[in-house]
């Protein structure tokens, strides 16, 4: 299928995707129904932490602290047997001088290689972008290739694992990360090339953010984040539900 000129459009504070449908709204019932008995690992920066916050809030698990000093967050939804973990990626540039306890952070590759082996119902979201604008291109490529190598090892043990890449998005020019949007846009293309053929779920939020009725910022408002997570659910729910049906028919 040809890639459309735009990924979708906004109407009444809702993003309508032209590449992913039907949509699964972000709410407690949908999260419990789709992601039951699942371990969700969200790795990345504070923009990925916003996804964690949106999901936990939808589940009624409270709004976690969302500031620059939170590097590890965990929540459990007992009714659906759903475990959520956010892990900040280490060794990246940060706009402020802060102390980081290295025991609370993990490389994406280590998160993948340390996945529980008693179940294949694991989802890993990774999104290395905002803090990597200062990196040499070769070094950033090596970082991605390390993640790819870990995915290949993990999928040999369990082919049903699901891996999700959350793309960069445009941000305001006055952001603490002094890089042009073209750098982050090129990261999107590089990720598609590095992970080609792995069946990776690519949640592309570039056009959604660029076309939103709110001002562009590194940390977009809750309405945008909720629509981003809705797109994530629209990918995950059909895949996980189809596997549930296979289990019930065996």
Where would I find each of the regions flagged by the language model?
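A compositional signature for long Ser/Thr(±Pro)-rich, low-complexity
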Residues: 1-250
